[in-house]
């Protein structure tokens, strides 16, 4: 979340760089350019607090249009109606206020607002973590369809690797502010190497009453291995090791002297 907010300028960067299309976007002058602000948008975790409660949905979704495009009131309204249709809401929603919608509807409106400037990258910060499972699936399906239709990229931030599996082609697993494992989806889900990745994967709920005990035992064994082998993953100060390359696409933060994982 901190990285995502730093990319769009909501959090200060104390060290390091973030490159977007070869440009350092932690440079304030670069980040303030109109093209960059148009091309990089964000969907926030808490949709209610990210909307001005005094504004109607028409004004909320139209805000990027007013910042970047010079449209007549009629063109603006028509564009907002098109965006609402994309997320499955009708024109009637335009004159309502944020509190009059469900959490899932508000999050879809957040998607529409992010989409209004026709961005190339949308940072999605835990966009479905506050929603129940059925609504999560609905919002994710809208996001996936929009991604294909508009040919845009997501920086999808989540603690739930079950959700991530549905959305992402490449994964970057972070712990204590550092990457502990990166790779293609197949690398991470079929061959996880860092214990933190394994712990996240073991936390994915599995509807499998037949193998419930076996799944529970695997989680216990992973925790036991972690407790007994922490030096494989962290130095004496608890710092994450640097990434080591396992394949063309798979990197993991292991002790360079370690021989394999669990």
Indicate where each model-derived feature is located.
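A short, surface-exposed alpha-helical micro-motif characterized by mixed small hydrophobic
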Residues: 164-166
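Conserved ABC ATPase "signature" region
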Residues: 24, 74-92, 201
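ABC ATPase "signature
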Residues: 179-183
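A short, proline-enriched helix->beta-strand linker immediately N-terminal to the Walker B motif
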Residues: 116-120
């Amino acid at each position: 979340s901190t990285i995502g907010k730093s990319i769009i300028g909501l959090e200060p960067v104390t060290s390091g760089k973030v490159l977007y299309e070869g440009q350092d976007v932690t440079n304030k002058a670069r980040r303030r350019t109109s093209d960059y602000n148009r091309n990089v948008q964000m969907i926030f975790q808490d949709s209610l607090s990210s909307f001005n409660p005094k504004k109607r949905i028409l004004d909320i979704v139209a805000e990027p249009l007013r910042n970047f495009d010079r449209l007549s009131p009629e063109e603006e309204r028509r564009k907002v109606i098109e965006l609402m249709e994309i997320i499955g809401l009708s024109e009637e929603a335009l004159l309502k206020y944020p509190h009059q919608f469900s959490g899932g509807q508000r999050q879809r409106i957040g998607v529409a607002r992010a989409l209004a400037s026709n961005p190339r990258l949308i940072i999605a910060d835990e966009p479905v973590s506050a929603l129940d499972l059925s609504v999560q699936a609905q919002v994710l399906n809208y996001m996936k369809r929009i991604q294909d239709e508009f040919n845009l990229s997501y920086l999808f931030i989540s603690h739930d690797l079950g959700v991530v599996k549905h959305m992402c082609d490449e994964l970057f697993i972070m712990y204590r502010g550092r990457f502990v494992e990166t790779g293609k989806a197949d690398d991470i889900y079929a061959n996880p190497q860092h214990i933190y990745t394994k712990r996240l994967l073991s936390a994915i709920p599995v509807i499998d009453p037949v193998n419930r005990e076996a799944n529970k035992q695997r989680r216990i064994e992973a925790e036991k291995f972690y407790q007994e082998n922490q030096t494989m993953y962290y130095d004496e100060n608890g710092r994450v090791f640097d990434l080591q390359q396992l394949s063309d696409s798979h990197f993991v933060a292991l002790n360079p002297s370690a021989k394999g994982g669990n």
